[in-house]
A protein has these predicted regions:
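Catalytic and substrate-binding regions of cell-wall glycan-acting enzymes that process beta-1,4-linked
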Residues: 21-48, 97, 111, 121, ...
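Substrate-binding/active-site groove segments that recognize
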Residues: 100-122, 130, 134-141, 175-177
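Short, functionally critical alpha-helical segments immediately adjacent to catalytic or ligand/cofactor-binding
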Residues: 78-95, 154-159, 202
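Solvent-exposed, acidic/flexible segments
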Residues: 51-66, 75-78, 98-106, 126-137, ...
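An acidic, Gly/Ser/Thr/Pro-rich helix-cap/linker signature
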Residues: 2-6, 10-77
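Inter-helical turn/loop segments and adjacent helix faces that build the functional surface
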Residues: 120, 144-155, 175
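Helix-loop elements that line ligand-binding/catalytic pockets
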Residues: 209-216
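Solvent-exposed, polar/charged alpha-helical surfaces in well-ordered, non-transmembrane soluble domains
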Residues: 67, 71, 83, 135-142, ...
Length: 216
């Protein structure tokens, strides 16, 4: 299974490398679909002391990377508000490190980073370059969008793994590709963290439109 996953990722990587600015469908957006979990996270981020501090720090760091990320999103025809995925991953902390050894603002693990074109060795770790890690993360997200057909499922796969999301989609809906609302049709089949991953991104996007309204 691991070998097959490696082959799939390598084929996708070299396909995207051949067309480095492959564009998604014009007009694609990461929509704000109303759901109680989005409202829940807006409230949590706004009122919980620890969450509020993390989000406030992230909003303060965001301008440092915003122009670069939005330029790269624009070049690829990707939704500008995918920048909030990085906020959810790391609050734009370039030295953030997880227990799974994911680092950087996009929190790529060593294996994922290598699969999507970055050097990760004992001497060199290109995830430490925000620009290079952004390129790798956007290549991965482009691949996931092409596989699943919408950004909600692509984001879920970014968090939980594409093969898991593919299995859940096939078992629940009989297909891999879907629409953003299908995320909530498979919601109860998702791992706990992934159930709140997309709602949290949408909540951050909502807060980012008017931070003062939410106490930031």
């Amino acid at each position: 299974m691991r070998f097959r996953s490696l082959i799939v990722a390598l084929v996708a990587f070299f396909s995207l490398a051949a067309k480095p600015h492959a564009k998604t469908t014009a007009g694609d957006v990461f929509p704000d679909i109303q759901h109680e979990r989005v409202d829940y996270w807006v409230s949590e981020f706004s009122t919980d002391h620890d969450y509020h501090k993390k989000i406030a720090d992230g909003l303060a760091r965001k301008p440092k990377y915003q122009k670069m990320i939005q330029r790269k999103l624009r070049e690829r025809g990707m939704p500008q508000n995918l920048i909030w995925l990085a906020m959810e991953e790391s609050a734009f902390d370039s030295i953030a490190c997880s227990r799974q050894k994911a680092i950087g603002i996009w929190q790529l693990t060593p294996d994922t980073a290598r699969l999507w074109g970055l050097k990760v060795t004992k001497k060199i770790d290109e995830r430490e370059s925000v620009e290079k890690e952004t390129d790798a993360a956007l290549r991965l997200l482009t691949h996931l969008h092409e596989r699943f057909g919408c950004w909600y499922l692509a984001a879920a796969a970014y968090n939980s793994g594409e093969h898991r999301i593919a299995r859940i989609m096939k078992k629940t809906l009989g297909r891999e590709k879907g629409r953003d609302r299908d995320y909530y049709r498979i919601w109860d089949k998702l791992p706990g963290e992934t159930r709140d991953y997309v709602p949290a991104i949408v909540a951050l996007k909502r807060i980012g439109k008017d931070p003062a309204k939410y106490g930031f």
